Design a protein with these regions (language model features):
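P-loop NTP-binding module
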Residues: 1-311
Length: 311
């Protein structure tokens, strides 16, 4: 039995034993259960080169800015005023010792360990059902990644049906990915930079009814090829897997997938069904979210098994 299967089974068992029991966290908590991963890994990795776009017809491209470099992003992308939600954003305030923050550092360490074995830059974060905390996990993961000196991250709200990432950041929703995929703006207009150094945000943009058509028209893949050399990590938050097919479309352009499972809530059969939508080689593991803050706070050295990886 795979370790991912074990993680899903444990989540179902916790759900069964706690029905009717109040869980007290004031905000979502990821529980990272892997005791041997306490030490940080900060291995320097070479930046990947941007693929050549010379063979791509200009007619297939959306509106694009010319001369795309990191320096051009700094000078031409709007620096917007963000008002991050203090209930869910763990790394924007002065106190970075809040319950849950260390679990994200552990997740960062695990991702770098996986990255030593396989190419890993474009990371998709999804869940089986709505309200499991995928956007919370994606937003805080992006923040903790840029906490390492010199690391750059772009977080993308690719949930075009029900965008919510902008609310975590307290950032404008438009223009964004949908507007870019429709050819109505270029990267410089759509990508935002806020107060946190090296962290960039591409919101979903306006809500559209044609999300599958936009996500599969090839423009998202071209966009990722165009910007990937500028960032160490690209985190994509997508629609949940069970209700719609959007996540499986976005997965075709990603290197790895994290599945968010909500403790005491996600039925194991639906979690397994969601897991089966993706190739084994892409699914990195499961993040168990929504665990009790009291349980984590009882021991500052407690680490559980929320990330179960196949690599």
């Amino acid at each position: 039995m795979s370790r991912i299967h074990d993680a899903l089974k444990r989540a179902e068992q916790e759900r069964a034993t706690s029905m009717g029991t109040h869980v007290e966290p004031s905000f979502d908590q990821p529980e990272l259960r892997n005791p041997e991963l306490r030490n940080e890994v900060s291995t320097e990795l070479p930046r990947e080169t941007m693929p050549s776009m010379s063979s791509t017809s200009a007619a297939t491209m959306p509106a694009m800015g010319s001369g795309l470099t990191y320096e051009s992003l700094l000078t031409r992308c709007p620096q917007t005023e963000w008002t991050p939600d203090p209930r869910t954003m763990l790394f924007f305030g002065e106190d970075e010792t809040r319950v849950g923050a260390e679990e994200f550092r552990t997740l960062r360490t695990r991702l770098y360990q996986i990255r030593e074995k396989m190419p890993l830059k474009r990371l998709l974060v999804t869940s089986a059902l709505p309200k499991e905390g995928k956007s919370f996990v994606a937003a805080n993961l992006a923040q903790v990644l840029v906490r390492q000196h010199g690391r750059r991250a772009l977080v993308i709200d690719a949930d075009l049906r029900n965008p919510g990432m902008h609310r975590h950041f307290g950032a404008p929703q438009t223009p964004g990915l949908a507007d870019y995929l429709l050819g109505e703006c270029d990267e410089f207009a759509a990508i935002q930079r806020g107060p946190m150094e090296n962290l960039f945000f591409l919101p979903a943009g306006r809500v559209v009814a044609s999300a599958p058509e936009l996500l599969s028209n090839g423009r998202l893949k071209l966009f990722l090829q165009r910007v990937e050399a500028l960032f160490d990590w690209i985190i994509l938050d997508t629609s949940p897997v069970i209700p719609v097919s959007d996540a499986t479309l976005v997965a075709n352009s990603c290197d790895g997938i994290l599945m968010v499972v909500r403790s005491n809530a996600t039925p194991s059969d639906l979690a397994r069904r969601a897991r089966e939508e993706f190739p084994d080689k892409l699914l990195l593991g499961v993040v168990l979210n929504g665990t009790s803050s009291a349980a984590l706070a009882r021991s500052k050295y407690y680490y559980g098994a929320a990330v179960s990886t196949q690599v």
